[in-house]
Regions:
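Conserved catalytic/acceptor-binding region of the Class I
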Residues: 15, 22, 26-95
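Conserved Class I S-adenosyl-L-methionine
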Residues: 63-158
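A conserved beta-strand element that flanks and buttresses the S-adenosyl-L-methionine
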Residues: 3
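A short His-aromatic
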Residues: 9-10
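Binding-interface segments
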Residues: 6
């Protein structure tokens, strides 16, 4: 078994990476992968809209190397007839809009923070928080639901 939980999206060239990982499996072995599916993420949609407008200088930073499900299908089907691809969405609850930003500060926001001055970082966070506050609903109990879309696939070596 080779598995990756929210990891391979940091590695480029999945067209080469996945067959390479697959080649290390024994017969009957399985590759199992879960990645954040940013294309369906409200948070990343807001972040990318911010980059399209005010923060264009950050737009060239490539966070993830995620492919489409169809692209993964083509890769996996070239390796084995025994594979599956599916999506899921986890619902996490947070206490505040700051908690949403905090969730991503250790991962998805870090490449942006790394190139900003302290003053720019503060302004960037304020801009992002404004968008978040306009697009995430506060529930009756005061909590906020943070939807986390995920893409999964498994492939077994015949």
């Amino acid at each position: 078994l080779i598995f990756s939980n929210a990891c391979i999206h940091w590695i480029p060239d999945h067209q080469t990476l996945i067959p390479s990982l697959f080649s290390h499996l024994s017969e009957g072995g399985r590759l199992a992968v879960q990645i954040p599916y940013k294309r369906k993420s409200v948070f990343y949609g807001l972040l990318f809209s911010l980059l399209d407008k005010k923060w264009k200088k950050l737009k060239e930073i490539r966070l993830f190397n995620e492919l489409t499900p169809e692209e993964y299908y083509d890769i996996l089907s070239s390796l084995s007839a025994d594979f599956s691809i599916w999506e899921s969405e986890y619902y996490h609850t947070v206490n505040s809009f700051d908690d949403i930003i905090g969730w991503y500060e250790g991962s998805g926001l870090r490449p942006y923070y790394d190139v900003l001055s302290p003053a720019e970082k503060e302004e960037f966070i304020a801009d992002l928080k404004k968008l978040i506050s306009e697009n995430f609903k506060i529930q009756q109990n005061g909590k906020i639901i943070l939807k986390m879309p995920r893409l999964f696939f498994t492939v077994t070596k015949d």
